[in-house]
A protein has these predicted regions:
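Short, non-helical or kinked segments that cap or interrupt transmembrane helices
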Residues: 1-14, 25-29
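Active-site nucleophile and cofactor-binding loops and adjacent substrate-binding regions
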Residues: 7-9, 34, 132
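Membrane-embedded alpha-helical segments of transport systems
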Residues: 7-15, 38-42, 174
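Hydrophobic alpha-helical transmembrane segments
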Residues: 18-23
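Glycine/threonine-rich beta-strand-loop-alpha-helix active-site module
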Residues: 26, 30, 34, 192-195
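Membrane-interfacial segments at transmembrane helix termini in multi-pass membrane proteins
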Residues: 30-94
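Structured cytosolic domains appended to multi-pass membrane proteins
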Residues: 75-253
Length: 253
């Protein structure tokens, strides 16, 4: 979705430039060319981040008939629910917490609640970082904008390539509304429609807490084996409410 939006932005710029040529309006030509060029560059960069060609993305290469892979043995497909209290205990005694935001965070408008939770953890001496996937959300830079709105420090927001090696050394990764960008099938399942797409290595963290409303699939339309992982627990409900409940439990510790 972010790639398509940036592509539409590029096409809008080119349309404005074409209109400027028709009207002999230099300002429209220059502005349209700038918007078109920037949109084209951004589209290309994001397509590379997904390891997909732009035509494949536009043609609906995701979720349009791919097999919903499980990424492992289908014999054990149960999820392990958790509570706000248990999640708070896990994070309060962690060596580090990595927050992985996704579109669900944007829908719930949970960025301020997440910032409050992170502040509480930092006051307890627990470092908090944010792992940002380049195509998380519904537009380019979506997660960066939301977190900046909540006054999250820029240095705490880490790009995928900068943070991926840290998951293996992290006690808790908390996934808030992210799905496809954390799906290990992209790394492990050659038959998956997202195979080869770079992902955040959330599954390598010692424990994972996933905040979701339900078990529905993400934009790619496939299941996520991460949710059934041995070290993964699920906290179901509205992300903002769940994060606020975790924060209240942290205050009591």
């Amino acid at each position: 979705m972010p790639v398509v939006i940036s592509l539409l932005n590029a096409m809008t710029g080119l349309s404005a430039a074409a209109a400027g040529l028709a009207l002999n309006n230099t300002a429209m030509i220059v502005a349209g060319m700038i918007v078109g060029a920037s949109g084209s560059i951004l589209t290309n960069l994001m397509a590379k981040a997904m390891n997909r060609s732009i035509p494949a993305i536009v043609a609906g290469g995701f979720g349009g008939g791919g097999v919903a892979v499980s990424g492992g043995d289908d014999g054990d497909r149960t999820v392990k629910p958790t509570s706000a209290a248990d999640a708070a205990i896990q994070m309060a005694y962690a060596n580090q917490v990595i927050v992985v935001p996704g579109y669900g965070l944007a829908v719930a408008q949970a960025q301020h609640a997440v910032k409050d939770m992170a502040t509480m953890l930092e006051n307890k001496g627990v470092p908090v970082k944010y792992a940002i996937h380049p195509v998380a959300g519904r537009m380019p830079g979506h997660m960066n904008v939301l977190l900046a709105e909540a006054d999250v420090e820029y240095d705490a927001m880490k790009e995928m390539d900068d943070i991926n090696d840290e998951f293996g050394r992290t006690d808790v990764a908390i996934v808030i509304g992210a799905n496809d960008v954390t799906n290990p099938a992209a790394r492990n399942e050659p038959n998956s429609p997202i195979y080869g797409m770079p992902i955040l290595n959330v599954d390598k963290a010692r424990s994972v807490i996933v905040l979701k409303r339900s078990m529905n699939s993400g934009f790619a339309g496939i299941d996520n084996p991460l949710f059934y992982g041995e070290g993964t627990t699920m906290l179901f409900g509205d992300a903002k409410k769940s994060v606020s409940e975790v924060t209240e439990e942290l205050k009591a510790l």
